[in-house]
Amino acid sequence: MERLKNHREFVAVLKRRRRVSDADIVLHYVVRTPSTPTGAAPARRLGLAVSKSVGNAVVRNTVKRRFRVLAHRYEHELPADCDIVLRAKPGAAHASFQSLEAQIQALFRAVMRKSEQS
């Protein structure tokens, strides 16, 4: 899974206002039209937003590491050309790894379901 690298890419996802949320995570997403050349694999891209309300730098980095691991683990459950931004709510700092895993898996499935409907 590639990364969203600059502010413009984050804003493009956040402006679409398509989101799903759970107790500790809000997932903003946009399914892109396939613009990759033939033969190139479609890319899913991930951005992370963990604000200071989650905790100090150590806590924020721990949350980001967990999000990255879980996003890579369940990326196959997302549409092929999809950009997502995972935004942590303050409760994510105290959530167990298993709880975050269940939430991310459910959110990714919800994105897949919603993208197939539209």
Swiss-Prot record:
GO terms for biological process: tRNA 5'-leader removal. SUPFAM superfamilies: Ribosomal protein S5 domain 2-like. Its EC number is 3.1.26.5. Keywords: Endonuclease, Hydrolase, Nuclease, RNA-binding, tRNA processing. It is an enzyme of class 3 (hydrolase). One of its GO terms (cellular component) is ribonuclease P complex. Pfam families: Ribonuclease_P (PF00825). One of its GO terms (molecular function) is ribonuclease P activity. Gene3D superfamilies: 3.30.230.10. It catalyses: Endonucleolytic cleavage of RNA, removing 5'-extranucleotides from tRNA precursor. Consists of a catalytic RNA component (M1 or rnpB) and a protein subunit. Belongs to the RnpA family. RNaseP catalyzes the removal of the 5'-leader sequence from pre-tRNA to produce the mature 5'-terminus. It can also cleave other RNA substrates such as 4.5S RNA. The protein component plays an auxiliary but essential role in vivo by binding to the 5'-leader sequence and broadening the substrate specificity of the ribozyme. HAMAP family: RNase_P (MF_00227). This is Ribonuclease P protein component.
